């Protein structure tokens, strides 16, 4: 019984404390008892909850660059945020790399087989191969050229179709975040382009494109690829270490 009285006393104290925080004087709260206290407390608690919700909605609206007065309820705000997210996703920049062989000897199957082969090779092996091609005066295998483009996600499909219709094979599609896939694309360029100056040009263009993307991972990969381009001595332990990527 004593515990019940203590619990009730503490609950009354908590309610009166809230009323004081809502602007009631201690003198006024002392006069409130029983049902009257409960009625006033519920009203003030409800008002506080509404204010907190309104503040939360307003803060989130501001974070998304929206007007708090216009989007003043979850029902209005959340669908608008979802719409913005979808629009941002459609506008997200994508990096596309295409290759065309002048002789017509390479096709999509060649690229597929090349990528498949690299799935069984370590990064250090692929990197060593790239450095070897960079140091080789001429490639006696293929005569080709490369196109590197950045487009919004909504345009990826039609851009792929456009370049395919011009005889190009896609060798990379993504946001520049996957270093292994980028290395495979680079090695494809090394194998597929005859002149070393042209290979240098494409690699420098790729690094610049990666740096321009709004993704930290892409910028980090640009630095790693630049290191490959600049390196004079190849260290297997370095390129195999996942901490670098």
UniProtKB/Swiss-Prot annotation:
Keywords: Covalent protein-DNA linkage, DNA replication, Nucleotide-binding, Phosphoprotein, Viral DNA replication, Virion. Its main location: virion. The modification O-(5'-phospho-DNA)-tyrosine is found at residue 194. GO terms for biological process: DNA replication; viral DNA genome replication. A motif (Nuclear localization signal) lies at residues 4-55. It is found in: Virion. GO terms for cellular component: virion component. The record marks 172 as: Interaction with the viral DNA polymerase. GO terms for molecular function: nucleotide binding. Changing residue 194 to F: Loss of DNA priming capacity. Interacts with the DNA-binding protein P1. This is DNA terminal protein.
